[in-house]
Amino acid sequence: MIVFTVKDMTCNHCSGAITRAVLLLDPAAKVRIDLSSHRVEIDPAAADAAGLGAAITEAGYTPVLVSAAA
């Protein structure tokens, strides 16, 4: 499980954009988003934390890695 906080994720549009960015990189990933805590949890199938963070950044957001447990 890879967890990011994304403070500039504030609405459903933001969460959808982040989900799409993650799934473009890793189509089999499972993404859970909690808007109230600005938390993005990703259970990746193929991508690593660096790649996922880069994908979220490319989508226009500022991810901060919280944890990257296997």
Predicted regions: what is each one?
Residues M1-A70:
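Flexible metal-binding regulatory segments at protein termini and peripheral loops
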